[in-house]
Swiss-Prot record:
GO terms for molecular function: beta-catenin binding. Belongs to the CTNNBIP1 family. Pfam families: ICAT (PF06384). Does not interact with CTNNB1. GO terms for biological process: cell differentiation; central nervous system development. SUPFAM superfamilies: beta-catenin-interacting protein ICAT (SSF81730). The keyword Lipid metabolism does not apply. This is Protein LZIC. It comes from Danio rerio (Zebrafish). Gene3D superfamilies: Beta-catenin-interacting ICAT. Required for neuronal survival during early development. Keywords: Coiled coil, Developmental protein, Differentiation, Neurogenesis.
Amino acid sequence: MASRGKSETSKLRQNMEEQLDRLMQQLQDLEECREDLEEEEYEETKKETLEQLSEFNDSLKKLMSGNMTLVDELGGMQLAIQAAISQAFKTPEVIRLFAKKQPGQLRTRLAEMDRDVMVGKLSRDVFTQQKVEILTALRKLGEKLTTEDEAFLAANASATLSHFEKVTASLGSEDKIMALASSGVGKTQT
């Protein structure tokens, strides 16, 4: 009986991760194709995707309140969704790696970005934004940042990222996290 519960939990987690991956990929594809879309079509598609993320977040909240064995596994996904909804992170790839708790891949992405900015393949503005997102994600995953990274983060963190960081610092306060997600959804719909 217990093994069946583990199997079902594993399958549910896999389905949830696949759903999150699909939504994050949809956001990433949308950003990559932005130039090919009319502004209205882009905004409508983004709004629909954020609504789907919000619905997915609501489902996660219900699952977390009803099944305590899933709390740890789903908590990371929920934080990633809230980051996307609040638009604290603008890079879907960073959100995906954060949700899957993959600090090694985040650090690899950071190294690739350092190289890309040096050879002129990546603009300084995009580099700064994505580096701040990655460093914030690493900090949220409990990774130790260098003094240099901490200084970079302090100098470049946006108000949205700072707000996300402050609210999620008290993970015990699910109401605050949900308030952040709700305010992010409200801002994107207006």
